[in-house]
Regions:
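Structural preference for solvent-exposed beta-strand-turn elements
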Residues: 4-7
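Compact, glycine-rich, soluble single-domain proteins
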Residues: 12-88
């Protein structure tokens, strides 16, 4: 799936709306946009909380890329776990 990447080096990602889980799994990167512009979350990212808008892309530029459209949401990063709450 990811060449030369150990499973423990991937980010655990959960993306949820009020009604359903949109994604639950592992990814190498998470890309989105906030008021300051575009940003990436990579493995072992520092703890982080931000509001996001428009989209979340998992594994941007890789064969496993997944794009999730949203109006707005919140992203939290803690201990290599990314949680995205859509529609907040």
């Amino acid at each position: 799936m990811y060449a030369n990447v150990k499973p423990e080096d991937l980010i655990t990602v959960t993306i949820k709306s009020r009604k359903e889980t949109l994604f639950e799994g592992r990814a190498f990167s998470v890309t989105s946009q906030n008021e300051g512009g575009f940003f990436d979350i990579l493995p072992f990212h520092t703890n982080y909380v931000t509001l996001v808008k428009d989209f979340v892309v998992l594994d941007k530029g890789l064969a496993t890329e997944k794009n999730i459209q949203l109006d707005k949401g919140i992203v939290t990063v803690t201990s290599n776990i990314v949680r995205v709450y859509v529609g907040i």
